[in-house]
Swiss-Prot record:
EC number: 1.17.1.4
A Pfam family reported for this protein in Swiss-Prot or TrEMBL: XdhC_CoxI
Organism: Bacillus subtilis (strain 168)
Enzyme class, first EC level, given as a word: oxidoreductase
Entry-linked InterPro entries: MoCofactor_Util/Proc, XdhC_CoxI, XdhC_Rossmann_dom
GO BP: any one term: hypoxanthine catabolic process
Keywords: NAD, Oxidoreductase, Purine metabolism
Record protein name field: Probable xanthine dehydrogenase subunit A
Role of this protein: Oxidizes hypoxanthine and xanthine to uric acid. PucA subunit could exert a molybdenum cofactor recruiting function.
Organism taxonomic ancestry: Bacteria, Bacillati, Bacillota, Bacilli, Bacillales
Amino acid sequence: MGNFHTMLDALLEDQEEAVLATIVQVEGSAYRKAGASMLFKKKGRRIGLLSGGCVEEDVFQRISALGDQLTSTLIPYDMRSEDDLSWGMGAGCNGIIHVHAERITQEKRRHYEKVRDCLHSGKAVTSVIKIESSHYLFLTENGHFGNWPDAPLQDIQRTVSTLHLPHFDQTTNMFIQRIEPKPRLILFGAGPDNVPLANLAADTGFSVIVTDWRPAYCTSSLFPKADQLITAFPEQMLSEFQFFPHDAAVVATHHYQHDQTIINFLFSQNLHYIGLLGSANRTKRLLSGKHPPSHFYSPVGLKIGAEGPEEIAVSVVAEIIQTRKRVAVV
């Protein structure tokens, strides 16, 4: 779902006709997993990837050939052969991918606007699609909406609560996936050494929020990829800002008292990642004997021997992604 938010913005920025292609099932191994999507807009713009470049053109040709007749269709691609004439293009992906292509109707576009509103408010949405039909449903914590009045809600909710998502049920031809809010990185400190971190985080799919008390530092010219800039002292910012459980925060103000104030406050919040820039000795003094939560990381970043702002940015973003995916580094 890493590029879903970009596709959603591209879909809703105008009324241009579009087709959404989504991998609903992978048998064996493949370049992308189930849930990966690609948006094809009528004027030729494409957002996202379904593979390493093996199937995208064929998907485009198929949906172009169907034209206005396309509503919803399932396309299988056998990537197992290493023959250059096959879909594997010699890559030996060793898997079969099933791609669902659907034309986005005006009704569904309006429902996607509701989806975006939910995501922007920090709430996840579960998407349910009846393959090879025009039926779909979106589930939220407050209810559901869509064009499927007789949807088997109990069966769907049972699947959502018991199975790992995304999930494709071949018996019912339903594809269910959970759409998470765009992960946010709140970066405390707008020093020039934090610019590479903000840029890399934005490039890898994070909504970046930079906050600093110095107006000369907290500017769009220094942080062009930041979604939000907050110029305020830590006490004011922390009292007014709404944090979400999927947020990651990196504290790098280089100001001892400010860092201590921020860290003490963040420890009381339900965040998935808190990182502190600085040496182990400085961190020990900042904590003043407090026992940090398990999602606190300092020195911040994976231990890759990073030097300089650019390499440190790589290590920090990699560590945040690792915690989100819950993958151990061997």
